Amino acid sequence: MADQLTPHLEIPTAIKPRDGRFGSGPSKVRLEQLQTLTTTAAALFGTSHRQAPVKNLVGRVRSGLAELFSLPDGYEVILGNGGATAFWDAAAFGLIDKRSLHLTYGEFSAKFASAVSKNPFVGEPIIITSDPGSAPEPQTDPSVDVIAWAHNETSTGVAVAVRRPEGSDDALVVIDATSGAGGLPVDIAETDAYYFAPQKNFASDGGLWLAIMSPAALSRIEAIAATGRWVPDFLSLPIAVENSLKNQTYNTPAIATLALLAEQIDWLVGNGGLDWAVKRTADSSQRLYSWAQERPYTTPFVTDPGLRSQVVGTIDFVDDVDAGTVAKILRANGIVDTEPYRKLGRNQLRVAMFPAVEPDDVSALTECVDWVVERL
């Protein structure tokens, strides 16, 4: 509900989105996914994750992702518990041999670099930074064996294309695809570790990480393990690989997370795969950005159209329109999670446009914002 200082405005039902969830993660979960938890997936709850029924569910996730991303020969889907946050530490222990290079342009791309800088077994990373709303050009350095950036910076709505930098040679390209995977175009052959969590484009719950790994990445994991480098078992990539190839996780996974994820993957593949998903997010984002450019009180925060994300849109408001008040009124009317990333501190709304979000609902959201602003 809105607080006492927020005007009480009741948005007409006729212009509201059919579904008012626009959060950037956790994100909208489709009703059809939820229904499987009490139907086809119900028998899996409370059963061993080392037995065939749950292992088959993990296998369904792995094979579905292999189809969705058209994996080249030798690439494997690896998974483990803990979310992308855990994978940052796992990668610091298990993918970086000596030194890494990081592009940072927001909260989440910076967090991987921070995790690496604290790891005692690798050298101080090279960190190339740009201001929020922009991004550095992917590049390499002869001293590094990992090059890392985010496909989509969730905090700012900046998307950076995934291509191996020229001259990267044997350096692994490690991409944080947490809010990009499944909604942005990618050629997996341009990456060595394309990792993500399932609570964004894949409309599931958090607490799980998945990484699509190349033969080079798998070889690197083996080579580092052979040196005897210490790593906690929970963060051990060799253990994660060994278990994943058996369609299981090192420790007990959340069945609901896997079931929701599997349903969403099947839905994406069944509708036309990644090409279909990318066209859908492109449609949604075109509606949002066109609206923002046409209004006198809004503008896209990301000024370079080539960097604007199709899956997370950030829209700045002029000073005399308080975006925070707009977000509170929207929330009081059942249109939720349009607030900006808390640490960015801008007068803006942030809108997720993952595949589960209907493009028509994005249009309805913009109509609701217009209705609210006209009455402030």
UniProtKB/Swiss-Prot annotation:
Binding site for L-glutamate: R50
Identification of the protein by name: Phosphoserine aminotransferase
Enzyme Commission number(s) from the entry: 2.6.1.52
InterPro entries: Aminotrans_V_dom (IPR000192), Pser_aminoTfrase (IPR022278), Pser_aminoTfrase_mycobac (IPR006272), PyrdxlP-dep_Trfase (IPR015424), PyrdxlP-dep_Trfase_major (IPR015421), PyrdxlP-dep_Trfase_small (IPR015422)
UniProt catalytic activity: O-phospho-L-serine + 2-oxoglutarate = 3-phosphooxypyruvate + L-glutamate; 4-(phosphooxy)-L-threonine + 2-oxoglutarate = (R)-3-hydroxy-2-oxo-4-phosphooxybutanoate + L-glutamate
Subunit comment: Homodimer.
GO cellular component assignments: cytoplasm; extracellular region; plasma membrane
Source organism of this protein record: Mycobacterium tuberculosis (strain ATCC 25618 / H37Rv)
Modification sites for N-acetylalanine: A2
